[in-house]
From Swiss-Prot:
Residues with glycosylation annotation: 27-28, 32, 34
Name recorded for this polypeptide: Protein 3
Main subcellular localisation: virion
Regions of this protein lying in the Cytoplasmic compartment: 56-78, 126-274
GO terms for MF: monoatomic ion channel activity
Topological domains annotated Extracellular: 1-34, 100-104
Species annotation: Bat coronavirus HKU3 (BtCoV)
Topology of the protein relative to the lipid bilayer: Multi-pass membrane protein
Domain CoV 3a-like viroporin CD: 145-237
C-alpha cells in the first residue's frame, strides 16, 4: 500500500526530512506532519492521462476512411497519440528514477521502449517505401505492397495485398454497373483518374520490386461489371532491362521501362477510356 501511494503521489520530487510538530502524548490528533515525498504533478494524473489518451486513440477509429483527407486525419491523430504516449512514458520513467523506484518497473519500461522502437522503425520503412513509390500512399494505407506506374501527369500508387502472377486494373468510366467512379481500381482500393496506364506496372514492397507487363485488355469479365476496361498484367520472367512491348500501331520492339509510357495522356489513338 505504501508503494502504491508513493507511486500515485509521485511528481516533482522534493525530499525533506520527516518531522512531526506539536505532538504530545495527550493530543496526537492535532499533530502537524511534514511528508518527505512532495508531488507537484502527481503520478496518478499521468495514469489518468494515459487512459484518456487510449480512449481518444480508439475513438479516432470511428473516422470514416473513404477519402484521402480522412485517411490523413486518422493517421495524424494516431501519430500525435503515439508521440504523447512516448512523452508520458519518458516523463514517468524519469519520475520513478528520481524516486529510486525504477527497479520494480524496469521490465515494463523495457517492453514499452522496444515497442516504440519497432513503431519508429516501421515509420522509417514506410517513408522509404514512399520514396520508392514516389507517393504518400504508403503512409496513408497499411498495405505491405503497392502497384505503381508513373506517367508524365501523375504517379500512381495503389495498395495491393501480395505478390501475384497476375495484376488486374479496372478502369471505370462513370457508367459502370455496379457503379464505379472514373478511376483505376484494384480490389477495394482505387486511385483517381489523372492519366493513362503504361505497358508495365511494378509492385513495390519493403524488399520487393516485381515488374508486370500488359498482356491483354478486356471490356468485360465474369465479375458482373459492365462498361469498364480491365487491364491484365502478367509477371515478367525476363530481365527488367529488356521488356518486350507492343506499340499502338501493332509493331513490337525492345525498350527500356524507363521510357515514356505507351498509354499516357489520352489521345484519339489510345485505348484508354476517357
Amino acid at each position: 500500500m505504501d508503494l502504491f501511494m508513493s507511486i500515485f503521489t509521485l511528481g516533482a520530487i522534493t525530499r525533506n526530512p520527516a518531522k512531526i510538530e506539536n505532538a504530545s502524548p495527550a493530543s496526537t490528533v492535532h499533530a502537524t506532519a511534514t511528508i518527505p515525498l512532495q508531488a507537484t504533478f502527481p503520478f496518478g494524473w499521468l495514469i489518468v492521462g494515459v487512459a484518456l489518451l487510449a480512449v481518444f486513440q480508439s475513438a479516432s477509429k470511428v473516422i470514416a476512411l473513404h477519402r484521402r483527407w480522412q485517411l490523413a486525419l486518422y493517421k495524424g491523430v494516431q501519430l500525435v497519440c503515439n508521440m504523447l504516449l512516448l512523452f508520458v512514458t519518458i516523463y514517468s520513467h524519469l519520475l520513478l528514477l528520481a524516486a529510486c523506484m525504477e527497479a520494480q518497473f524496469l521490465y515494463i519500461y523495457a517492453l514499452i521502449y522496444i515497442l516504440q522502437i519497432v513503431s519508429f522503425c516501421r515509420f522509417i520503412m514506410r517513408c522509404w517505401l514512399c520514396w520508392k513509390c514516389r507517393s504518400k500512399n504508403p503512409l496513408l494505407y497499411d498495405a505491405n505492397y503497392f502497384v505503381c506506374w508513373h506517367t508524365n501527369n501523375y504517379d500512381y500508387c495503389i495498395p495491393y495485398n501480395s505478390v501475384t502472377d497476375t495484376v488486374v486494373i479496372t478502369s471505370g468510366d462513370g457508367t459502370n454497373q455496379p457503379k464505379l467512379k472514373e478511376d483505376y481500381q484494384i480490389g477495394g482500393y482505387s486511385e483517381d483518374w489523372h492519366s493513362g496506364v503504361k505497358d508495365y506496372v511494378v509492385i513495390y514492397g519493403y524488399f520487393t520490386e516485381v515488374y508486370y507487363q500488359l498482356e491483354s485488355t478486356q471490356l468485360s469479365t465474369d465479375t458482373g461489371a459492365e462498361n469498364a476496361t480491365f487491364f491484365i498484367y502478367s509477371k515478367l520472367v525476363k530481365d527488367v532491362d529488356h521488356v518486350q512491348i507492343h506499340t499502338i500501331d501493332g509493331s513490337s520492339g525492345v525498350v527500356n521501362p524507363a521510357m515514356d509510357p505507351i498509354y499516357d495522356e489520352p489521345t484519339t489513338t489510345t485505348s484508354v477510356p476517357l
